[in-house]
From Swiss-Prot:
PROSITE patterns: GLOBIN
GO biological process: hydrogen peroxide catabolic process
GO cellular component annotations of the record: blood microparticle; haptoglobin-hemoglobin complex; hemoglobin complex
Name of the protein: Hemoglobin subunit alpha-1
Protein family per UniProt: Belongs to the globin family.
Organism phylogeny: Eukaryota, Metazoa, Chordata, Craniata, Vertebrata
Keyword Transport among record annotations: yes
InterPro entries tied to this protein: Globin (IPR000971), Globin-like_sf (IPR009050), Globin/Proto (IPR012292), Hemoglobin_a-typ (IPR002338), Hemoglobin_oxygen_transport (IPR050056), Hemoglobin_pi (IPR002339)
GO molecular function: haptoglobin binding; heme binding; iron ion binding; organic acid binding; oxygen binding; oxygen carrier activity; peroxidase activity
Length: 142
């Protein structure tokens, strides 16, 4: 999926507005994913998955940090996310559908925290971006 210049502007502007909250939102989105889609918990048998868990928050920050890297390298996502793609495809063997589920929960979390900024155009741009990131992360599965 190709991101238009308007998409890139929407994504960058939105991500910049998150400021220091990206990690917090990543943890909240991950917790929301586990609660809404219980099968996603199978990849984290060693985690305390209870609400407010420090392990979930820490992993959510890793997710947010990876997305921050992706935002900074929107023009070359395959290179920027290559190591992460390898990790999820070859070591963790995460079912690709889980990226779509987490993406949905990220959109919901961002909409909850920034309703005024979450216009239809921003929603569409972020959805395209998360879909593109998911595609890159699953590209090595084939």
């Amino acid at each position: 999926m190709v991101l238009s210049p308007a998409d890139k502007t929407n994504i960058k502007t939105t991500w910049d507005k998150l400021g220091g909250h990206a990690g917090e939102y990543g943890g909240e989105a991950l917790e929301r994913t586990f609660m809404s889609f219980p099968t996603t918990k199978t990849y984290f048998p060693h985690f305390d998955l209870s609400p407010g868990s420090a392990q979930v928050k820490a992993h959510g920050k890793k997710v947010a940090d990876a997305l921050t890297t992706a935002v900074a390298h929107m023009d070359d996502l395959p290179k920027a996310l290559s190591a992460l793609s390898d990790l999820h495809a070859y070591k963790l063997r995460v079912d690709p559908v889980n990226f779509k589920l987490l993406s949905h929960c990220l959109l919901v979390t961002l909409a909850c925290h920034h309703p005024a900024e979450f216009t239809p155009a921003v929603h569409a741009s972020l959805d395209k971006f998360f879909s593109t990131v998911s595609t890159v992360l699953t590209s090595k599965y084939r």
